[in-house]
Amino acid sequence: MSEEESKTKVVILTRSYRIKGYIHLQPGARVTDFMIDSKNFMAVTNVEVWDLGGRQIMTSPFVNVSRDHVEIITPDTA
């Protein structure tokens, strides 16, 4: 992460998983801008992956999430 980027905590929902982690945004950028600019995959750091039943199935310092599988992405305010 460069000094110009800031971490934003997000929740990502796919058909199978709830993913919590951080995306790295340029100053002034929105989550919407991040999604528009993403290619096939988006980098997420400090990740927790949960199944839809609420069971945590993995943690990882980094994952690439397929943009095509993202149904909802929202800032995590919890």
Region annotations inferred by a language model:
Residues M1-A78:
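Conserved RNA-binding domains used in RNP assembly and mRNA/RNA metabolism
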